[in-house]
Swiss-Prot record:
GO terms for molecular function: proton-transporting ATP synthase activity, rotational mechanism. It is a peripheral membrane protein. Pfam families: OSCP. Belongs to the ATPase delta chain family. F-type ATPases have 2 components, F(1) - the catalytic core - and F(0) - the membrane proton channel. F(1) has five subunits: alpha(3), beta(3), gamma(1), delta(1), epsilon(1). F(0) has three main subunits: a(1), b(2) and c(10-14). The alpha and beta chains form an alternating ring which encloses part of the gamma chain. F(1) is attached to F(0) by a central stalk formed by the gamma and epsilon chains, while a peripheral stalk is formed by the delta and b chains. SUPFAM superfamilies: N-terminal domain of the delta subunit of the F1F0-ATP synthase (SSF47928). F(1)F(0) ATP synthase produces ATP from ADP in the presence of a proton or sodium gradient. F-type ATPases consist of two structural domains, F(1) containing the extramembraneous catalytic core and F(0) containing the membrane proton channel, linked together by a central stalk and a peripheral stalk. During catalysis, ATP synthesis in the catalytic domain of F(1) is coupled via a rotary mechanism of the central stalk subunits to proton translocation. Disulfide bonds: none annotated. The gene is atpH. One of its GO terms (cellular component) is proton-transporting ATP synthase complex. It is found in: Cell membrane. Keywords: ATP synthesis, Cell membrane, CF(1), Hydrogen ion transport, Ion transport, Membrane, Transport. InterPro entries: ATP_synth_OSCP/delta_N_sf (IPR026015), ATPase_OSCP/d_CS (IPR020781), ATPase_OSCP/dsu (IPR000711). This is ATP synthase subunit delta.
Amino acid sequence: MALSREETARRYGTAIFDFAKDSGKTELMYSELTELKKAVQAEPRFVQVLSNPVLDAKQKKSLLTAVEQGFSAELQEVLNFLLSYDRFDNLVDIIDYYIHLYNAANHIGTGVAKTVLKLDEDQLQRLADSYAKKYGLQALHLENEVDPEIIGGVVLEVEGRVIDGSVKHRLEKIRAMLTK
């Protein structure tokens, strides 16, 4: 029975996290996997080629060897492992699960800040630091989404929690109070 994408990501992501933990390289693996994910998203053909059943294992290995030279021995071992089990089509999902485990182990949150105007890096970082401090996180990685419908303010969505500080939400609350 074939594994679902989610189950494959969970199993392999957990195995990679355990491997990195045992070798004391979780942070190094995190940074390298994050960089690899960015590269793969910028050039998705890389995964398509290494997942292509038409290419034989020797061709795939030579392509991978050319790419992995800038990475640590541990990540090279992981990439060769994934290649040997034909799991490169799940690479981004596996990396995402590793990042999820790393963030959970290090009390790092991820989320989205919706605003009317794009926040600069300093504003986004101050917002993330404030939220992290309030909710006991070591750090918070926020992405900024522009949503003109909120009129003003900020809507934070972090780890399943929503804090709606938007003008739209405040107006809806006032409208509800007035109609009672």
